[in-house]
Amino acid sequence: MDIPLVSPRKLDQYVARYPGVWIVDVRSGEEYRRSHIRYAVNIPYDPGKEWNLPGEKEIVVYCERGATSMAAVREMIRQGYRALSVAGGITEYKGRNLVFSE
């Protein structure tokens, strides 16, 4: 199965184009608290879990480098969600919506 991807450089444009998109950070809670993309919800990845997300929303998923978010997106798609992964993860994201803990 091909995993749909969004470029980290185009993520801000994508989110602006599709208002209401859900951004899901699948890293640990500790990693999320250190830094995350503004408006992202933190749902740590747990292989085989049943995702409980709004079915009518487009879902953008990211992790540290992209591998975990791709696995999560694969499972989300199998469960009927419209999801895509941020290529390269938060490591590659340089957009204006990056939030660091204070």
Which role does the model predict for each range below?
Residues 1-22, 28-58, 65-102:
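Rhodanese-like catalytic fold shared by cysteine-dependent sulfurtransferases
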